[in-house]
Design a protein with these regions (language model features):
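N-terminal active-site segment of His-dependent metallophosphoesterases
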Residues: 1-57
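Beta-strand-turn-beta hairpins that frame and shape the catalytic cleft
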Residues: 7-14, 122-132, 190
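Residue-level marker for buried hydrophobic side chains located in beta-strands
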Residues: 15, 42-44, 69-70, 132, ...
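Divalent metal-coordination and catalytic microenvironments
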Residues: 18, 47, 62, 72-73, ...
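Active-site environment of divalent metal-dependent phosphoester hydrolases
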Residues: 20-24, 50-53, 76-80, 139-141, ...
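Active-site neighborhood of divalent metal-dependent phosphoester bond hydrolases
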Residues: 55-123, 127-130, 147, 154-165
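Short, well-ordered beta-strand micro-motif
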Residues: 122, 133-135, 208-212
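Conserved beta-sheet core of the metallophosphoesterase superfamily
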Residues: 155-218
Length: 218
């Protein structure tokens, strides 16, 4: 499931790393950037929830017309847990916030957000170039997303293979891809893949970058 977005001709496009409940930190970052909710757009790499203090507020960001997010593995864990699967796994990985919330409210907000989240975004930027966003690990060829198999979906949500192996082979068929999932000390490139999860929930550093800046790093 890939969603393609046309060029933003009115404002700027930004991308943010894994939020993990750090709603206030995001709002501070957007204020510093003078983010304009009328014309600007913000894309997230998934994992809006867990670990930080404000998971419900981060999920509610999906109600805003300027905010877009792909699915992350933490959203996948939460959806499965609320269906009776992987509950302990979710609780051990930051899901305990749900115990302080009204379960029907969590289920409703989470499912609404989940249904609105694609597995990948492809965004047109200046010069006819295209930037992709997935949560964890992109395929070797961007065209693989047009035939979404279970194996491809699992890699998009969970894999760290490229980072672990230091693979700098460019993803074919796309100018650049932005991912989260794997915490890095600062944003970094491997080939044409940019890693932007700087571990905001424990480092207090949340990365928000203009999409055009990502292409400048190539």
């Amino acid at each position: 499931m890939i969603e393609r977005m046309a060029l933003n001709t009115e404002g700027k496009d930004y991308v943010v790393g894994d939020l993990h409940g750090e709603y206030d930190r995001l709002m501070s970052a957007l204020e510093a950037l003078e983010f304009n909710t009328v014309v600007d757009r913000l894309f997230a790499v998934g994992d809006l929830i867990d670990r930080g203090p404000s998971s419900m507020q981060c999920l509610a960001l999906m109600d805003n017309p300027w905010f877009f997010s792909v699915r992350g593995n933490h959203e996948a864990m939460a959806v499965n847990a609320l269906k009776g699967r992987m509950w302990n796994n979710w609780q051990e990985n930051g899901g305990r916030w749900v115990l302080k919330e009204n379960p029907p409210d969590v289920s409703r907000v989470l499912n609404q957000a989940w249904q609105a989240m694609p597995l990948a975004y492809e965004i047109e930027v200046s010069g006819g170039r295209r930037v992709g966003i997935v949560h964890a690990n992109p395929p070797a060829r961007w065209s693989e997303l047009d035939d979404m198999t279970e194996e491809v979906e699992t890699r998009l949500l969970w894999s760290r293979r490229r980072h672990k192996t230091g693979d700098t082979t460019p993803v074919e068929g796309i100018d650049a891809v932005i991912v989260g999932h794997t915490v890095v000390g600062s944003p970094m490139m491997l080939g044409n893949v940019r890693y932007i999860d700087t571990g905001a929930y424990h480092t207090r550093r949340l990365t928000v970058e203009p999409l055009d800046q990502v292409l400048a790093c190539l």
